[in-house]
A protein has these predicted regions:
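Ubiquitin-like/PB1-type beta-grasp interaction modules and other compact soluble beta-rich domains
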Residues: 1-88
Length: 89
């Protein structure tokens, strides 16, 4: 399952979450597939071939920054959260 938060939701067609029935082997492949499904989301997710610095991705509540980045492997029952980086002051 993929969950969308904050200003990411409108980019994913207003969805709060969606089931992903075509499991991808790793986070990067999943994000690319989601970007093909939701074109505005793709533009926000990527800066060239790198994940955008304005996005936080969690797999089962753990940041991919502390796992294997976009190469983090996925299992069919994993939950992937897509958050915007919020600026604060």
């Amino acid at each position: 399952m993929v969950k969308y938060f904050g200003d990411i939701r409108p980019l994913a067609g207003g969805l709060k979450k969606e089931e992903w029935r075509h499991p991808e082997p790793e986070v990067g492949a999943l994000l690319r597939a989601l970007g093909k499904r939701h074109e505005p989301l793709e533009k926000r997710l990527w800066e060239g071939n790198q994940l955008s610095s304005t996005i936080i991705i969690l797999v089962n509540g753990r940041s991919i920054d502390f796992l294997n980045g976009i190469e983090t492997p996925l299992r069919p029952d994993d939950i992937v959260d897509v958050f915007p980086v919020e600026a604060g002051g």
